[in-house]
UniProtKB/Swiss-Prot annotation:
Quaternary data: Interacts with ZMYND8.
Biased composition (Polar residues): 234-244
Gene: ZNF687
Residues where Omega-N-methylarginine is found: 1060, 1101
InterPro entries listed in its UniProt record: Zn532-like, Znf-C2H2_11, Znf_C2H2_sf, Znf_C2H2_type
GO molecular function: DNA binding; DNA-binding transcription factor activity; zinc ion binding
Organism per entry: Homo sapiens (Human)
Protein name: Zinc finger protein 687
Length: 1237
């Protein structure tokens, strides 16, 4: 074969067409088999060559990062997990077209990804094709020192110096320490089935290793703390004097030992040696059809014998990836024995000038001893020498290294490369179960990962994933079919495709995230950040920024989706770039929803040539200064928050905002940190807030913590009690959010502005996809459209079909006599499989499922957005509405009454003229917002407020405006979307111009603007008629008012010039009426009339400037002066009551006044003559007959004008007809006429 220099084992092994497993023996695996101690493995199919820039030598992270740097392996704490919702509509043919990949491409596309362990059908497709499907590039086998492997030629056997690379110092391995006593096996650990044949050691004679075929089977060892399904292949290492493998007879059950040297792992289960909090390194499985398997190098499974079809637990094995950036120079020898077995031997080429010193004879890595360590702290601080007794009495000694020496990805890669030097041969007729193939590596690099209170169990086993909870966005379904193409990892059905996509996104990595060497030599002059440039999606950090860019640009597979939020078709080539895009939506309070998912492997020549792959850690936190520690997070202050709904309780308490006025000191509310509800003593203010915000059970006798008075869900019984007392306005006034005790004067202000308690709402989480909705109708609509299945039921028989054509074909073939009948639609509940014949029944049925799904959500007080966490809402407020809040706070008093803009009159609207943010908030939110009142600003502020309101409402619907459905609380940025939604979802016909602030809609934009200005802004630009006495007639246009006055009252509105008014030469009266005249002039000139709720003609008595004619305060006792005054008034065109001196604009008003105030029904003689404006012909005094009663007809020669309302008629008949409209006046006139006769 010759020497070959290759960046990894995959490219190297892909050069040989050796069938590892028959394609007919593809494994069908389901999610129920995807659990392991390290959490269910979530694969990223087809991402075999997704290179992780771990060593980053090629990317510029600095060459030669020491593999023994223990601080590089510290896993980062958790940060919020990004979720992606997939509603796939891809056709199965799209995935079938990918099934014909070549072996080389398949090796790269279907290998272990940096995103996590390979899934069920992904593993099988990557390694089960007729051609050698390689496990991807995770094994860049090169020592960190830059040297290549050196083949050790020893007489008879080749001792495997497996761990010489991993000790803190090479000499530590040879120190003979007392052998550790064998510890008892874990509960349930049984003796694994014996191996049919012994593992073979490399022999020095010849460039390859020829295993003897007739070697007797080696008895399997009973491993310490290993389950019965986790036998492990003995990776024998030692000096030349170690016993030969052929000399080891088979034994039924050797005694249990600590650190069993077998590395064969059960493919069906992960070894329980690794607790759910300890990452487990797992092998890249290669399957062989009924023949001795060839185990590719993996950090934990150097030799994995396999036989037969693999079981379905493959996706629970996370494949560790190597992190060395140096290629491995190896020699491969492939031999097919006479019995049909295939032996593939990988040895290093002697190129390292200073190879590590060989260990003692028979040295092993005692994996079990490593994994026996507790989840958080290792048990051994230094190397230990353990003794293993084999079945024939032979005792082998091995060195067990502490966890600290194997903490980075580079070390794990070296271990994988070292282990790959040996091959295990099994005879064809082995009795080993397919699930016993090299499946579970017992965590060669156990790490103490941070804990999180809100861990979510993924998969059916309910195991906890490390670090933080990852929300499974789709229900797990068993994969229905395998993918059979070399390198093709795409499922053939949409459900399995979406399931595979979810496994990619939620995969767990069992190796720590890479940490670069951030201490470059002084002569380099590099200024590196304290924690490097870190990928928030996988936790890997890099020394240089371009290395992080290369990390995001790597090509592992092609993921093509349609982002529903961006409304664009996007293509991603790795998981980190996809999650980075999803995080951008998450920062805006949205969960990324995508559809039309298509996943394809990337050709080998299109992948970026990065030799290294490092597994991801799915959770990360922003970089923190100082050394990284591994505390148990989520149990106190500073707990890392997660965006998953299931981890809301683990977030740090949200403290009140510092927006309270100085008059209300906040410190007085926290003099004693004792809960007044349950008397629990807290440490400080943050502890008090955490006590009131942590999720807890409801009060005794209550089923939930939902307030029956308002739509609000409280976190626990203490918060609920304080909230209930808030409704009753009873002391003590305890804030349900922070637990502070406030005075009643400051309590409401604190709730509204500091703690934002009023922003809580009741939301509903979809039980299928975990998306939270703000209303019952919206989640019902979501469940019906997204998760419920609709069937077409045959009207004759009980059969139902998913499509109408299928039901029609069934009727045509099975019921020919009923072909004309139509199939009936039936609806299946997505949560309990109940079938309903009517859609409304299904909607009502959802109520019993939604009660347990209630969650607390938070609505932004300035826009309709809903948030699952209060902290996210506060960040949104700070980033989006900060300027508006500052302006509002500047103009806000210490405390004020709440005013709603919808009901305030014109004067109140003017008084809030400077409160521009209040108008903007009320115009952009669909819910009634409470705007604190402010001191009355100057009048000129009125115009900017109105312009701002009109500007905000005239927009096209973008920004914080938009339209919100009042039924389902869905928000739409575009008007057309809102109109279509109302018609489609709720069956309501909405006109083209709907109002953002209420449910009314209009046919034209001017009508909408007028509606908003009058009804919502309180600026009533209307024109009331002064002459109408019946009702309050107002007009929206001055032109319409003038026409009305001309037609109805027979007056010219233009004749009411500013000169109209009292011109008495009396100083006091003139001074009293001067302001009135000026105000009326100003009102007429700016076209702003008083509100029609108060008739302008009847101004308040004593208000000299309220109307056009105030009451005449001067009254004379002599009739002469009265007549003089009356003459002046008549000439001036006004009407005055001679009894009290009040002036009126029309005779009708004067008549009504005299009848109500003075009980006079007759005419007023000359004093009641109709006054005309300047320029009009003056009516003769004889128009009203003082002795003629209430006759509608005027005196001879006068115009035909009604004396009640002053309307002019063209004929006496029309005047009589008109006079009938005055009711009692007409009746009295008839009665008077009869009396005269």
């Amino acid at each position: 074969m010759g020497d070959m220099k290759t960046p990894d084992f995959d490219d190297l092994l892909a050069a040989f067409d050796i069938p590892d497993i028959d394609a007919n023996e593809a494994i069908h695996s389901g999610p129920e088999e995807n659990e392991g101690p390290g959490g269910p493995g979530k694969p990223e199919p087809g991402v075999g060559s997704e290179s992780e820039d771990t060593a980053a030598a090629s990317a510029g992270d600095g060459p030669g990062v020491p593999a023994q740097a223990s601080d590089h392996g510290l896993p980062p704490p958790d940060i919020s997990v990004v979720s992606v919702i997939v509603k796939n509509t891809v056709c199965p043919e799209q995935s079938e077209a990918l099934a014909g990949g070549s072996a080389g491409d398949g090796a790269q596309a279907a290998g272990v990804t940096k995103e996590g362990p390979v899934g069920p059908h992904r593993m099988q497709n990557g390694f089960g094709s007729p051609e050698p499907s390689l496990p991807g590039t995770p094994h860049s086998p090169a020592p960190p020192s830059g040297g290549t492997w050196k083949e050790k030629g020893m007489e008879g056997k080749t001792p495997l110096d497996l761990f010489a690379h991993f000790g803190p110092e090479p000499g530590d391995h040879s120190d003979p320490l007392p052998p550790s006593a064998p510890s008892p096996t874990r509960e349930g650990a049984l003796t694994p089935p014996p191996f049919p044949s012994s593992f073979e050691l490399a022999q020095e004679n010849g460039p390859g290793m020829q295993p003897p075929v007739s070697s007797p089977p080696l008895g399997a060892l009973k491993q310490e703390s290993c389950s019965p399904h986790h036998p492990q292949v003995l990776a024998q290492q030692g000096s030349g004097s170690s016993p030969k493998a052929t000399d080891i007879p088979a034994s039924a059950s050797p005694p249990p030992v600590a650190g069993v040297p077998f590395f064969k792992q059960s493919p069906g289960h992960q070894s329980p040696l690794a607790s759910p909090k300890v990452p487990v390194c797992q092998p890249l499985k290669e399957e062989d059809d009924d023949e001795g398997p060839v185990d590719k190098s993996s950090p934990g499974s150097p030799q994995s014998p396999s036989s037969g079809a693999e079981a379905a637990d493959e996706d629970s094995n996370d494949s560790p990836a190597s992190s060395s950036s140096r290629p491995l120079k190896v020699r491969i020898k492939t031999i097919k024995t006479s019995c049909g077995n295939i032996t593939r031997t990988v040895t290093q080429v002697p190129s390292d000038p200073d190879p590590p010193a060989p260990l003692a004879e028979g040295a092993f890595l005692a994996e079990a001893s490593l994994l026996k360590l507790s989840p958080a702290t290792p048990t051994s601080e230094g190397p230990k020498v353990v003794s293993v007794q084999l079945g024939d009495g032979t005792r082998l000694k091995g060195t067990v290294l502490p966890v600290a020496t194997i903490q980075n990805a580079s070390t794990a890669m070296l271990m994988a490369a070292s282990v790959a030097r040996k091959a295990v041969v099994l005879p064809g007729g082995t009795a080993t179960s397919p699930k016993m193939i090299a499946k579970n590596v017992l965590g060669l690099v156990p790490q103490a990962l941070p804990k999180a209170d809100g861990r979510a169990g993924l998969g059916t086993g309910g195991q906890k994933v490390n670090g933080a909870s990852v929300v499974m966005v789709q229900p797990s379904k068993t994969a229905t079919g395998p993918s059979t193409g070399g390198g093709t990892v795409i499922s053939r059905t949409q459900s399995s495709l979406v399931e595979a996509f979810n496994k990619i996104l939620n995969s767990k990595n069992l190796l720590p995230a890479y940490r670069p060497n951030l201490s470059p030599p002084a002569e380099a002059g590099l200024a590196l950040p304290p924690t490097g440039y870190r990928c928030l999606e996988c936790g890997d950090a890099f020394s240089l920024e371009k290395s992080l860019a290369r990390h995001y640009d790597r090509r592992s597979m092609r993921i093509e989706v349609t982002c529903n939020h961006c409304a664009r078709r996007l293509v991603f080539f790795n998981k980190c770039s996809l999650l980075l895009h999803a995080r951008e939506h998450k920062d805006k309070g949205l969960v990324m929803q995508c559809s039309h998912l298509v996943m394809r492997p990337v050709a080998l020549d299109q992948m970026v040539g990065q030799p290294d792959i490092t597994p991801l850690l799915p959770v990360a936190v922003p970089p923190v200064s100082g050394p990284l520690a591994l505390p148990a997070l989520g149990k106190g202050e500073g707990a890392i928050t997660s965006s998953a709904i299931t981890t809301v309780a683990a977030e740090a308490p949200v403290l009140p905002l510092s927006t309270e006025p100085p008059a209300a000191p906040a410190t007085s509310a926290y003099t004693c940190f004792r809960c007044l509800e349950c008397k629990e003593q807290c440490r400080d203010k943050a502890g008090m807030a955490a006590h009131f915000q942590q999720l807890g059970p409801p009060a005794p006798g209550a089923t939930s913590n939902v307030c029956p008075t308002c739509p609000m869900m409280l976190p626990n019984r203490c918060s609920f009690s304080a909230h209930q007392r808030m409704h009753k306005n009873r002391p003590p006034h305890v804030c349900p959010e922070c637990g502070g005790n406030f005075l009643q004067a400051n309590f409401q202000t604190h709730l509204r502005e500091a703690c934002l308690h009023v922003s809580r709402r009741v939301g509903y989480r979809c039980p299928s996809c975990s998306v939270v909705f703000g209303g019952v109708n919206s989640i019902k609509s979501h469940i019906q459209t997204s998760h419920c299945e609709v069937f077409h039921k045959c009207p004759i028989c009980p059969m139902a079909f998913k499509s109408g054509p299928s039901a029609h074909a069934h009727l045509y073939s099975q019921h020919p006599s009923f072909q004309t009948q139509q199939a009936k639609l039936i609806y299946k509940c997505a949560m309990c499989d109940t079938v309903f014949t009517h859609k409304p029944l299904l909607s009502s049925h959802f109520d019993q499922h939604l009660l347990p799904q209630r969650v607390s959500v938070f609505k932004c007080p300035s826009c309709p957005l809903l948030f699952a966490q209060k902290r996210t809402m506060l960040e949104h407020l700070k980033n989006t509405h900060q300027s508006g809040r500052l302006e509002e706070t500047a103009g806000k008093g210490a405390g004020g009454a709440l005013l709603t803009p919808k009901t305030e009159p014109e004067e109140l609207a003017v008084s809030q003229g400077g409160a521009a943010p209040a108008t903007e908030e009320s115009s952009s939110s669909s819910e009634e917002e409470e705007v604190p009142s402010s001191p009355e600003p100057p009048r000129p502020a009125k115009r900017p407020r109105r312009e701002l309101g009109s500007k905000g409402l005239k927009g096209g619907g973008g920004g914080p405006g938009g339209w919100t459905c009042g039924l389902c609380h869905s928000w739409f940025p575009e008007r057309d979307e809102y109109v279509a939604h109302m018609k489609k979802e709720h069956g309501k016909s909405v006109k083209k111009f709907p109002c953002r602030l209420c449910e009314r809609s209009f046919c034209s934009a001017p009508s909408l603007r007028r509606h908003v200005r009058v009804n919502h802004e309180g600026i009533k630009r209307v024109y009331p008629c002064r002459y109408c006495t019946e009702g309050k007639r107002t007009f929206s246009s001055r032109l319409i008012l003038e026409k009305h006055v001309q037609v109805r009252h027979g007056l010219q509105l233009g004749a009411q010039s500013p000169g109209r008014g009292t011109t008495l030469a009396r100083g006091s009266s003139a001074r009293a009426q001067g302001p009135g005249r000026k105000r009326r002039q100003s009102s007429d000139s700016c076209s702003e009339e008083p509100d029609s709720t108060t008739p302008p003609a009847k101004s308040p008595r004593g208000g000299p400037g309220s109307g056009g004619h105030g009451p005449l305060r001067y009254r004379s006792s002599s009739s002469t002066e009265q007549s003089l005054m009356m003459g002046l008034r008549v000439e001036d065109g006004a009407q005055q009551c001679l009894d009290c001196g009040l002036c009126f604009a029309s005779p009708g008003s004067l008549s009504r006044h005299r009848f109500i105030s003075h009980k006079k029904r007759r005419g007023v003689g000359k004093a009641s003559a109709l006054g005309l404006g300047d320029g009009e012909e003056e009516a003769p005094p004889s128009r009203s007959d003082p002795d003629g009663g209430d006759s509608p007809l005027p005196a001879s020669g006068g115009p035909l004008t009604c004396k009640v309302c002053g309307k002019s008629c063209d004929s006496p008949l029309n005047l009589k007809t008109h006079f009938r409209t005055h009711g009692m006046a007409f009746i009295r006139a008839r009665q008077g006429a009869v009396g005269d006769n």
